[in-house]
């Protein structure tokens, strides 16, 4: 019996057509609302669902691309105490996230890939926006008088 999976299961991912025994389909998949039987109506719904998922994926990629451009245009300025050789403190992902939020850019703290910047001057921090997209944020650290 052919069924369309509604949710991910051990048999396959959501929105895929699989072939299972009628008993398994009736007693487990349909009962737990994990699948629906394959027929003309559900096949049309599946095509629409896949198109909708593809559209959403493209929109998300466009948003990520815009966010990357916005982040790469930005320069964050921080002040740290210290003298010529040593710096007291560091710029952490938490501080960077806070500054980005002030500028209206919201990213997850784990997306900011830094172990703490503790040198004066210009540095670049990678911000992982998706599995394929990484933005480089420019950070300038000056001496606090």
Curated annotation (Swiss-Prot):
GO CC annotation: ribonucleoprotein complex; ribosome
A GO biological process held by the record: translation
Superkingdom as given in the UniProt entry: Bacteria
Matching SUPFAM superfamilies: L9 N-domain-like (SSF55658), Ribosomal protein L9 C-domain (SSF55653)
GO molecular function (one): rRNA binding
Similarity comment: Belongs to the bacterial ribosomal protein bL9 family.
Task performed by this protein: Binds to the 23S rRNA.
HAMAP family, sorted: Ribosomal_bL9
UniProt-listed PANTHER family: 50S RIBOSOMAL PROTEIN L9
UniProt-recorded name of the protein: Large ribosomal subunit protein bL9
Organism: Mesomycoplasma hyopneumoniae (strain J / ATCC 25934 / NCTC 10110) (Mycoplasma hyopneumoniae)
Gene coding for it: rplI
């Amino acid at each position: 019996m052919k069924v369309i999976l509604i949710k991910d299961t051990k048999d396959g991912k959501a929105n895929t057509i699989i072939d299972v025994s009628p008993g398994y389909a009736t007693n487990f998949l349909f009962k737990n609302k994990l699948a629906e039987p394959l027929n003309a109506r559900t096949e049309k719904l599946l095509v629409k669902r896949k198109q909708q998922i593809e559209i959403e994926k493209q929109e998300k990629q466009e948003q990520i691309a815009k966010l990357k451009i916005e982040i790469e245009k930005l320069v964050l300025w921080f002040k740290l105490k210290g003298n010529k050789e040593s710096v007291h403190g560091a710029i952490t992902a938490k501080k960077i996230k806070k500054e980005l939020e002030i500028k209206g850019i919201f990213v997850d703290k784990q997306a900011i890939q830094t172990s703490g910047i503790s040198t004066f001057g210009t540095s670049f921090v990678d911000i992982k926006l998706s599995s394929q997209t990484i933005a480089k944020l420019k950070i300038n650290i000056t001496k606090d008088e």
